[in-house]
Amino acid sequence: MAELLAIKWDDNRDKLILLDQTILPNKIEYIEYDTAEGVYDSIKDMIVRGAPAIGVTAAYGLYFAAKVAPEDNFENFFKYLKEKSSYLDSSRPTAVNLSWALKVMESKALENKDKDVKEIKSILREEAKRIHEEDIEICKTIGENLITLLKDGMGILTHCNAGQLATSKYGTATSPMYLAKEKGWNFKVYSDETRPRLQGSTLTALELYEAGIDVTTITDNMAAMVMSQGKIDAVIVGCDRVAANGDTANKIGTMGVSILAKYFGIPMYIAAPTPSIDINTKTGEDIPIEERNPEEVTSRFGAWTAPKGVKVYNPGFDVTPHENITAIVTEKGIVYPPFKENLKKLFEK
């Protein structure tokens, strides 16, 4: 699946290369970026999507800003960097990895403020690359932790895309699926279509199918029936932000899946890199929810699917209550309820 990596870095040409996910599965095209403005647009327009991938992309975007920042003194350089960081951070408000990656880059600049500005620019380049490489390792470790909760022969439901296309590699929710495939396990994955942008059918189903994993696409409103038929043994989803109490923001529709899973007694697992866990956000009520273009709901494939001018409510995310979550699986280990206490302990390790 190397050809379907969401993010590539060209070290020789100093360019970020992103897979255009808005045209999948019909076309596979990559777009090159070397400016903060281009990176902003790639995040806003969902050329790149998925919290981990957004964070990595933003880190490179801030490096591109640093490249053209003033070099006369650190104060002017950092002022410019902060302005561009705020600009990039405004591209999508819900995914905490975005602000996390930008803060890491800012901190790296501050740590080296006594050095020549040109040297700081090189340091930020290496820091963006480190964030990229770290994401790959985090995803693999999450998969290794998640697979301990699964068994050969299981049926797994996932929602949206927390796969390789949402991260630097492996994915979070899909990482154990790739590892199980390597082990020779026989298992089935059911991929919710995920209205309105269809990330489950256009992205998750695509990458799993290409990897030779047994995947079946279902519409979102089929999940209850599939669960009632005993076809689902576990639900695994990713996340865009986890609050301190375990409430989890993920793609719209995830909350409904969690309610169904709880009703049918099916474990609900959140695959969460620690950068997606926001201890400073107390509960899900404090998570900002992005509202997206109404036309994502009212038109598709060049045709209107609702009356022109009809009112539309199109939040990009919902919040799954912590009561509906069986475990939050991170690269540092598996966290069980009570989440408020145990997530805090996770960061004290």
UniProtKB/Swiss-Prot annotation:
Annotated keywords: Carbohydrate metabolism, Isomerase
Gene Ontology molecular function, alphabetical: S-methyl-5-thioribose-1-phosphate isomerase activity
Active-site residues, record numbering mapped to chain: D240
Source organism, top-level taxon: Bacteria
Record's catalysed reaction(s): 5-deoxy-alpha-D-ribose 1-phosphate = 5-deoxy-D-ribulose 1-phosphate
InterPro entries: Deoxyribose1P_isomerase_DrdI, IF-2B-related, IF-M1Pi, IF_2B-like_C, Initiation_fac_2B_a/b/d, M1Pi_N, NagB/RpiA_transferase-like
Site (Transition state stabilizer): C160
SUPFAM superfamilies from the UniProt entry: NagB/RpiA/CoA transferase-like
GO biological process: L-methionine salvage from methylthioadenosine; pentose catabolic process
Pathway per the UniProt entry: Carbohydrate degradation
Ligand binding (substrate): R49, G50, A51, R92, Q199, N250, K251
Pfam families attached to this UniProt entry: IF-2B
EC number: 5.3.1.-
Sequence similarity: Belongs to the EIF-2B alpha/beta/delta subunits family. DrdI subfamily.
Functional description taken from the UniProt entry: Catalyzes the isomerization of 5-deoxy-alpha-D-ribose 1-phosphate to 5-deoxy-D-ribulose 1-phosphate, as part of a 5-deoxyribose salvage pathway that recycles this toxic radical SAM enzyme by-product to mainstream metabolites.
NCBIfam families registered for this protein in UniProt: eIF-2B_rel (TIGR00524), PRK05720.1 (NF004326), salvage_mtnA (TIGR00512)
Protein name per Swiss-Prot or TrEMBL: 5-deoxyribose 1-phosphate isomerase
Organism annotation: Clostridium botulinum (strain Okra / Type B1)
Gene name tied to this protein: drdI
